[in-house]
Amino acid sequence: MTDLPDSTRWQLWIVAFGFFMQSLDTTIVNTALPSMAQSLGESPLHMHMVIVSYVLTVAVMLPASGWLADKVGVRNIFFTAIVLFTLGSLFCALSGTLNELLLARALQGVGGAMMVPVGRLTVMKIVPREQYMAAMTFVTLPGQVGPLLGPALGGLLVEYASWHWIFLINIPVGIIGAIATLLLMPNYTMQTRRFDLSGFLLLAVGMAVLTLALDGSKGTGLSPLTIAGLVAVGVVALVLYLLHARNNNRALFSLKLFRTRTFSLGLAGSFAGRIGSGMLPFMTPVFLQIGLGFSPFHAGLMMIPMVLGSMGMKRIVVQVVNRFGYRRVLVATTLGLSLVTLLFMTTALLGWYYVLPFVLFLQGMVNSTRFSSMNTLTLKDLPDNLASSGNSLLSMIMQLSMSIGVTIAGLLLGLFGSQHVSVDSGTTQTVFMYTWLSMALIIALPAFIFARVPNDTHQNVAISRRKRSAQ
């Protein structure tokens, strides 16, 4: 990339900045949840909604981000994304109640939903095609550093300052990024087709109310009738979308995607798989602090081996999949992650704390292998004319399943414990034990889906290439 103009390199730095902000925010909050609960006078069992409100908003807004960038311009949308994310951070820091914090996190989520996909689109437009992979590697590297720094930095700020600072640090970074975007980034636009607003609203309503109904089933004060009504509204909205998308060439996501078997299996497996693994980043720091009495900083440091294991495994995951095939790798990593989850719970409850970093490192390796395999399985056989739509749907499902996973984790804690779980409670470790056992079972269930994946990987790739070349 040394032969790129200086202006283009600066634009890549801006995109990388945005990737870093978004990835840091996804991990820095987890370590601070117990301190937030104490400061806001809430039960720790309710704090999962701080994560859910952000991730669910990202899932809802993702389908609109690419269309908005093409219609209004990548600079205008990227600038708007940074401003919304920064304002959301400010309002998070100023929040005095849990409801205020949830609204502020939703505003952050709107910005976060546009930042990464619009950043990818910007890179596609400003660099030559032959340098696109090198440019994407450059801008996504800070996004890999964010999860590494997030837990420890969050714990450090909480322990030696206050939880408000995990949001306040975004403000100067956001201001610099917004100004640089206005000054340096070109405002590319493209001719767009009409946006599928009806489909977007149906999907948004369906995802939001079903998640709310799931969360409302324990300890929120919603009546059974209200919850049943929410479920009915959500199901009707999703069924209406299916009817809307049938034979509709302008649908947000074409139903033709599901004619590709590996896409259908991969998407179903990704949804179920990320529900289970989405619980882990929320539950692990909460368990370390509330269940075992770790300090926020110590709990944050304990998360670093998991990220290192994930980053290290990315270097060899392709060779592993090529050697053993998708079916074997996905079934083995799914069951393996369930066993590692049980191992983490056992070693922690036995007090073998010196073993935990190694267990978390192993967890990161297994999880990374499964994530990469699920992503490539889902998209690898799609024809070229459906690849972009399939990738967008996969991104939305990834965020949605993570929000559902965190919601279920909070639901399990509320089911097995009281509304006042604390370090001083004699039953706290028992509550967490039952929760971890349930999580291990949920994590293992997608193995039944992955067992149906065709095993001849190389043949599938060849078939896929012949299909694409024939179109």
UniProtKB/Swiss-Prot annotation:
Residues 33-48, 98-101, 159-164, 218-224, 284-285, 363-395, 452-471 are cytoplasmic. SUPFAM superfamilies: MFS general substrate transporter. Induction: Transcriptionally regulated by BaeR. The lineage of its organism: Bacteria, Pseudomonadati, Pseudomonadota, Gammaproteobacteria, Enterobacterales. Coiled coil: none annotated. It holds the Pfam family MFS_1. The chain crosses the membrane at residues 12-32, 49-69, 77-97, 102-124, 138-158, 165-185, 197-217, 225-245, 263-283, 286-306, 342-362, 396-416, 431-451. It is found in: Cell inner membrane. The gene is mdtD. GO terms for cellular component: plasma membrane. GO terms for molecular function: transmembrane transporter activity. Keywords: Cell inner membrane, Cell membrane, Membrane, Transmembrane, Transmembrane helix, Transport. This is Putative multidrug resistance protein MdtD. Disulfide bonds: none annotated. It is a multi-pass membrane protein. Belongs to the major facilitator superfamily. TCR/Tet family.
